[in-house]
Amino acid sequence: MSSKDIVLAFSGGLDTSFCIPYLQERGYAVHTVFADTGGVDAEERDFIEKRAAELGAASHVTVDGGPAIWEGFVKPFVWAGEGYQGQYPLLVSDRYLIVDAALKRAEELGTRIIAHGCTGMGNDQVRFDLAVKALGDYQIVAPIREIQKEHTQTRAYEQKYLEERGFGVRAKQKAYTINENLLGVTMSGGEIDRWEAPGEGARGWCAPRSAWPTEALTVTLKFVEGEAVALDGKALPGAQILAKLNTLFAQYGVGRGVYTGDTVIGLKGRIVFEAPGLISLLTAHRALEDAVLTKQQNRFKPDVARKWVELVYEGFYHDPLKTDIEAFLKSSQSKVNGEVTLETRGGRVDAVAVRSPHLLNAKGATYAQSADWGVEEAEGFIKLFGMSSTLYAQVNR
């Protein structure tokens, strides 16, 4: 019987390593795809490719996911300007770009069968499956979910399964579950899951306070229609700007937090996250928006943005409503042009200067200092503006 081609989203970790022989023994020719979304170096990329070959993959491709993650997620996320439940900056949204890479490979191979290594307990399975289903009529195979029906200690089972077939398992044991990409780092497990204070081991990019530089860091970002296009006067692709911001602001411990929130499947989730570049980018963009958008725009946009963030978090990346909201967000950015200077001395980042041809500062008017209207006009405005509250007070004394 000839093997059926299947495309596996592959990371080289235990779960996806297990998937290759598991799928082969069920009649599949396994083609692996690694979408590099910024979480590995050249040495790790080389390991992943060799690991796929060692495990018997029929083919392996590595895809540069940096440009896609910038266009597909970072731009609209910065336009939205909101974290999930007001805090979490959606750091595993690269999953949608991984799905895109896997489906492109499936199209090249002429197969409609896709596999992933998600468990049956987390959010990622929802994001993977909904994204695949939204993009076509594909069969989804999830080996880890399948073995969880029969085995409670799945990782121990996976390790034994590989060892019995002569495949080694990486010796290093991690105290935490870590996700890392261009957007940032998330950590869970250990004392984090026990609702205790995270230990110093629960640290990825962000330097501890004791290691912060003594001199302040100042950088300038240039925006064109809401998109960062230059850093300190040098034009760069967006993904490179974000990578540089990660490096610069991580030294000062910027963008680190502990987040507790509601998962897609209804459980409470607790993680440590680090997003120095993304938080810095959001801070600069928000300062520019505050200066150039109208009062009504700045009031209304967060309501729409929250819905966009919820859709992305919950797996509805390809829902038409998300597309509709993005059209509004893009329209709102037509005047978000200018430069913002950021400064940090450690732990937080502030926008300390804004320059734009669209600043909404009326000529002759400076807040609380001077104005080109008279005292009588100010008194008349106050009287009319507060009329409803004044009448209520008079009637109900």
UniProtKB/Swiss-Prot annotation:
Keywords: Amino-acid biosynthesis, Arginine biosynthesis, ATP-binding, Cytoplasm, Ligase, Nucleotide-binding. PANTHER family: ARGININOSUCCINATE SYNTHASE (PTHR11587:SF2). Pfam families: Arginosuc_syn_C, Arginosuc_synth. The keyword Transcription regulation does not apply. GO terms for cellular component: cytoplasm. It is found in: Cytoplasm. L-aspartate binds at T119, N123, D124. It catalyses: L-citrulline + L-aspartate + ATP = 2-(N(omega)-L-arginino)succinate + AMP + diphosphate + H(+). It comes from the Bacteria. One of its GO terms (molecular function) is argininosuccinate synthase activity. HAMAP family: Arg_succ_synth_type1 (MF_00005). Its EC number is 6.3.4.5. Belongs to the argininosuccinate synthase family. Type 1 subfamily. ATP binds at A9, F10, S11, G12, G13, L14, D15, T16, S17, A35, G117. GO terms for biological process: argininosuccinate metabolic process; L-arginine biosynthetic process; urea cycle. Transmembrane segments: none annotated. The lineage of its organism: Bacteria, Pseudomonadati, Pseudomonadota, Gammaproteobacteria, Lysobacterales. This is Argininosuccinate synthase.
